[in-house]
Amino acid sequence: MELSDVRCLTGSEELYTIHPTPPAGDGRSASRPQRLLWQTAVRHITEQRFIHGHRGGSGSGSGGSGKASDPAGGGPNHHAPQLSGDSALPLYSLGPGERAHSTCGTKVFPERSGSGSASGSGGGGDLGFLHLDCAPSNSDFFLNGGYSYRGVIFPTLRNSFKSRDLERLYQRYFLGQRRKSEVVMNVLDVLTKLTLLVLHLSLASAPMDPLKGILLGFFTGIEVVICALVVVRKDTTSHTYLQYSGVVTWVAMTTQILAAGLGYGLLGDGIGYVLFTLFATYSMLPLPLTWAILAGLGTSLLQVILQVVIPRLAVISINQVVAQAVLFMCMNTAGIFISYLSDRAQRQAFLETRRCVEARLRLETENQRQERLVLSVLPRFVVLEMINDMTNVEDEHLQHQFHRIYIHRYENVSILFADVKGFTNLSTTLSAQELVRMLNELFARFDRLAHEHHCLRIKILGDCYYCVSGLPEPRQDHAHCCVEMGLSMIKTIRYVRSRTKHDVDMRIGIHSGSVLCGVLGLRKWQFDVWSWDVDIANKLESGGIPGRIHISKATLDCLNGDYNVEEGHGKERNEFLRKHNIETYLIKQPEDSLLSLPEDIVKESVSSSDRRNSGATFTEGSWSPELPFDNIVGKQNTLAALTRNSINLLPNHLAQALHVQSGPEEINKRIEHTIDLRSGDKLRREHIKPFSLMFKDSSLEHKYSQMRDEVFKSNLVCAFIVLLFITAIQSLLPSSRVMPMTIQFSILIMLHSALVLITTAEDYKCLPLILRKTCCWINETYLARNVIIFASILINFLGAILNILWCDFDKSIPLKNLTFNSSAVFTDICSYPEYFVFTGVLAMVTCAVFLRLNSVLKLAVLLIMIAIYALLTETVYAGLFLRYDNLNHSGEDFLGTKEVSLLLMAMFLLAVFYHGQQLEYTARLDFLWRVQAKEEINEMKELREHNENMLRNILPSHVARHFLEKDRDNEELYSQSYDAVGVMFASIPGFADFYSQTEMNNQGVECLRLLNEIIADFDELLGEDRFQDIEKIKTIGSTYMAVSGLSPEKQQCEDKWGHLCALADFSLALTESIQEINKHSFNNFELRIGISHGSVVAGVIGAKKPQYDIWGKTVNLASRMDSTGVSGRIQVPEETYLILKDQGFAFDYRGEIYVKGISEQEGKIKTYFLLGRVQPNPFILPPRRLPGQYSLAAVVLGLVQSLNRQRQKQLLNENNNTGIIKGHYNRRTLLSPSGTEPGAQAEGTDKSDLP
């Protein structure tokens, strides 16, 4: 059995993955893909690396990789929000070369090499919500993360952050705690002095020297003044003054030591006070570690020099001086460990706070990106209506069953259709990049004109552009707006023609009436309009004249005679207009007006010779169109148009900001705000009990108690070092019984060595397996760790006190009858009973060494120690102290050694307990921040899943990666040419006859409901494995457009036409699907499908509403194969037939047909009807449905719920005095500042559930 079976993984083979557990009760989510499109793009989207809410380490050094555990038990099957699981989170970060371990197989650690981009098991990907390549470890923040060996961390002098701003914020973050510690230390010292004064006046054998009283009052006054200054300046954010006040406090205490050495102290020779000063310097004064070390060494050296130069004892020996030096060295060593590891813990807590703040900021950024993506699909008024309906939906899992369509009916609108004449020829002469650039600039210009003329762009269909006026805000002049829009479009296209020398023009049709608008289907959502009037506007365009605006009688009636018109004769050019007897007219516009440039066009700065290039643009110098998705995934994450007129969906009032900066500056600002909130200890009052510091939530307390203590080994090694110092101190003093003392300390050292061995065994493969298993269990078990800690403290305590048992003092003699010969020279250790107390103090400091030991347990242990010492010094061995006092302080105004010793221990008890309380509070606050950060990160993960759904429904995956993964500072528009692509159009000819706008079918809404079901079924077919190479492009009314072979992998695949076969299979599957729908809807719809293949140009155009589309002869031919086809049949041209017939498909020859736009140059086209497959494709697996798609309503619902949670947290964090959490986003929160509705109430809104 390998060691990896015993303890957690270490080394480069580790993989840090978090597999999100599907929500309970949601069967569909179990199969949802875990891989997100944002996986490799997070760093580029947010301009900084993703700082996760978990531990990361550095993989350097021979000691192993620096690693740490998952914050709240994030094992492989852990679901963070419930804080379930058995793994635990570490309290401290690990520096370079450090090593951390976990339970046997229960934890997974981060790997710095970053393999998160690999695909996970099950084919779904393993991203979870972290990507380690962009996740800096804690060591990335530190100048020096410390040195570790075999899991034991040793202090270093420099323990600061690399960033000055981060260091400044850290100092401010713990400013309040350090201020409080300094005040408590000074108050404790003042109380000690007052207690000494009272005891001295009541118990001293001689009156107090007046100079002692003056010095006592002076130093007490200094400390009171320091406390007052620190308290008065509590609002100061600078930590420098606090450090200087700490230096002043240290100087005052050291001066008192000097006074004691000169004979003017109340604590005898002052050794005990030196120990307290050293402990306070390292653990309670706000001094950097380097300053504390210098101060500690200075204090120790001063005391040793005073003992040598001005001896205060009757008998002084070199051994005694060395013992004092060793005593001070021990306290300095323990203090350095305590100070370094405490500061490390506080820095870790600060980093966790920073991670929490950054997670919240990223969540807000994800909210904004979600909103932008939604608004790129839907107009604002539709989003408002959906949010208003969803605002009270609280069921977390309802979004997975939420299938509502939102159809709005608007009366009195005008619809404009515009088509670029000559575009087909243009697409054959321009390169892909040039074509997409021209279209983007042209349609960006149209979008700008639409805004100026109060029109809403609906959709771009290849080279067709259509918009509506009077939607959503009703306008009396909607027809005028559309006519002016059309005139501006004609001016613009003629300007383009003059600049590019290409024969292009606009054919425009306008009709007035009513529309239904909304979004249908589950994939490639696009806002669209439907109605009989929309069809008429479309036919007016197709039956129009290039360069003229073709309008209907309904539109003419709305114009009120403001424009000159002439007969349009549309019936002569369009069968639909003739069949329905629609009168048409042409707007008469002076030719010179049409030839003039649009008013907003200024002279370009480019020369005409440059413009004659085939790649030339026509954009003027003062304006250039935005790139698609710049306002969504661009580096300047500016707020979307949400902030204008409007919706304050963003948490923490981010909508008031000009930019959302996710860089360090914004995070630091947020941390400053968090510091202000934290200063009120609100979090502590809400979650932590006052004295015990236990969590009020028992499950949270259990989770905290199960945390792995990453510095437990370091604490135990430090305790062992303290034992060695205790042994050295007592060995330096002479003993009459050397052998018993040798045996005693040998046993204690062996026992403590065994404790160290058993807790570090997992790092030594040479040790027995059972020992390594035991080691792993101890390190992961709260109770076992506490047993080891208590055993270590007990051993040190026994080492400090057992030597008193070997004293030769006759205990049978009553103390009151004792007489002492002051001239006698004692060379036995019992002659120095104060060292039993001093080493006992070191044993008490051992409690402070164990940073994670519960402060209440520390208090209990310390009280037991003091009780035992009180029992020994006041009763059994009181004579030792009396004899010592008579020998060294006879006749002086000196308080008894045993009284001073108990007071010294009481000082240490209070100091160690308070220090333990501060550390535990920091650790528990750290834990709370981590839990909160992890919850918010999981919320961000959910939002990213929604965003991935949104993005996947706007762009194909490989195109989305293009926009997310690359540095697009100077990047051109996305465009790509393909040589071997399959294109399919599938329409439902009978749906036009089925569609009617009557009261019975809710003015056409019920007809659209059925169309939504049909499109949704088609979309779900794309979720099958066999159709993974097919991309839906769009729906055009009741026509479904799909393409195969767009992914780069398929272009280089050996099976060049495998995707075309899949497209043919897909068309056959569509016919089967429509038959199933007919059975349930009692209809007889038939599909008319056209398929073609060849070269196309693909690209993304439009900045505010980006659209992915394809252009070229192949697209036109596929569309004509549909429009010239036969209901219930699949028509393909001869070239496509020649490929598919060899792939197992059967065909029926139709004959030669005339195809508009192609037959003019190439003659009639031979076409065939696809009948089906003759033989199955051996490479096609049985149909397996991939995870289902969510409706747009479901995605918006997820966004609303996330925003509600953020709003509730915000109000809680801000401690709203109203006591009422209004956490829901309703229609009022989404109104403009003036309080008016942003649009007219939609009529006929349908919100009933789909079957």
Curated annotation (Swiss-Prot):
List the residues marked with site Essential for CALM1 interaction. Answer: 1205, 1207
Ranges facing Cytoplasmic side: 1-182, 342-715, 915-1251
One Pfam family from the record: Guanylate_cyc
Residue list for modification Omega-N-methylarginine:
55
What Gene Ontology molecular-function terms does this entry list? actin binding; adenylate cyclase activity; ATP binding; calcium- and calmodulin-responsive adenylate cyclase activity; calmodulin binding; metal ion binding; protein dimerization activity; protein heterodimerization activity
Involved in CALM1 interaction: annotated span: 1109-1251
Indicate which residues the UniProt annotation says bind ATP.
Answer: 419-424, 461-463, 507, 1034, 1109-1111, 1116-1120, 1156
Where in the chain is the site Essential for autoinhibition maintenance?
1200
Instruction: Describe the subunit structure.
Output: Homodimer; via transmembrane domain. Monomer. Heterodimer. Oligemer; via transmembrane domain. Interacts with PRKAR2A and AKAP5; inhibits adenylate cyclase activity through PKA phosphorylation. Interacts with PPP2CA and PPP2R1A; does not mediate the inhibitory effects of PKA on adenylate cyclase activity; interaction is dependent of catalytically active PPP2CA; antagonizes interaction with calmodulin. Interacts with AKAP5 (palmitoylated form); promotes the phosphorylation of ADCY8 after store-operated calcium entry (SOCE) stimulation at membrane raft.
Write out the similarity annotation.
Belongs to the adenylyl cyclase class-4/guanylyl cyclase family.
Protein name, entry field: Adenylate cyclase type 8
Instruction: Tell me which species this is from.
Output: Homo sapiens
The gene for this chain is: ADCY8
